[in-house]
């Protein structure tokens, strides 16, 4: 880990991890092989459709498409993750920077394969551009916005997985 600058919306006191992306678990979680070992990265400011976890936790529409879109952007590429904390699952919470300097997090939202993570009054939203990017994707009918009735992943986890109202 090396200290990272507070530029580009990344908080001061953050840290950078650099290495190849060796796994794309879903539309907002990847594994990066850093010099000290593999690190699970939870992409900040976004929440992608949930993959299924057996019969008790069915997946959301567009979960596979979201994972595939992210894989097309990052799989096998050496990237820098600008990180600022670890979450309750011991994942580094980061912005993934693509080789051209763009944010993979923003690219997921722009393409309509993730939501701006506005749950809990925006507690998880670090990038203030995300709601506007989501609005543009929705208005253009991109990705999951191509069909009506899209349910935010945080609502899906509660309603479907906890309350069994899928």
Predicted regions and their residues:
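Small beta-barrel nucleic-acid-binding modules, primarily SNase/OB-fold domains
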Residues: 1-166
């Amino acid at each position: 880990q090396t200290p990272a600058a507070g530029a580009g919306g990344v908080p001061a006191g953050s840290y950078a991890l650099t290495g190849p992306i060796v796994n794309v678990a879903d539309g907002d979680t990847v594994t990066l092989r850093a010099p000290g070992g593999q690190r699970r990265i939870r992409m900040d400011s976004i929440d992608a459709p949930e993959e299924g976890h057996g019969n008790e936790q069915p997946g959301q529409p567009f979960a596979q498409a979201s994972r595939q879109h992210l894989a097309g952007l990052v799989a096998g590429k050496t990237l820098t993750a600008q990180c600022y904390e670890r979450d309750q699952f011991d994942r580094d919470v980061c912005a993934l920077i693509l080789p051209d300097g763009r944010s993979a997090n923003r690219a997921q939202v722009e393409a309509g394969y993730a939501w701006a993570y506005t749950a809990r009054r925006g507690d998880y939203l670090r990038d203030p551009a995300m709601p506007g990017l989501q609005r543009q994707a929705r208005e253009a009918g991109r990705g999951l916005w191509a069909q009506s009735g899209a349910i935010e992943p945080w609502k899906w986890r509660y309603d479907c997985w906890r309350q069994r109202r899928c």
